[in-house]
Amino acid sequence: MPKILIVEDEINLRDVYSSRLEAESYTISVASNGEEALAVAVRDRPDLILLDVMLPKISGFDVLDIIRTTPEIAHTRVIMMTALSAPKDKERGEKLGVDKFLVKSQVTLEEVVSTIKSVLDSSAAATTQNEQVLGSTGTQRSASASTAEPAAPAPPANQPPANQPPAN
């Protein structure tokens, strides 16, 4: 099952999210601040991070910015969960590369679970599609490399190809 890192400084919310997602058979790790989140993300390489914005030590926005510039975890899916509901906050998250931006007061726990499934499903579909493209490309390359003959040099501009008689 996919691994999810829950980054939430509010212990009750962290416990609720953890319990609910474990019931869906996700493997859960948790962090209570931005600094810890980055360490756990690099160590555990989660498939998805559920990230609060207002965190101690390093804000969720700064955590996301660091995630997107850290090669080992740059492609990790991130859902921001926050009390911030201003459009500028959502825009900031989108500019930093968040996959989904949810306002805590506007979603139920079941909507959070549904969003997580949707983001993970789209991630899996994209991975499968990329593997198919790479796989078929790799197969074509290896097949053509083993069976292709070197191309014959082009004839000079004023001469017909060698296998055709000259025109009179």
Question: What are these model-derived regions, one by one?
Answer:
Residues 8:
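Conserved acidic carboxylate
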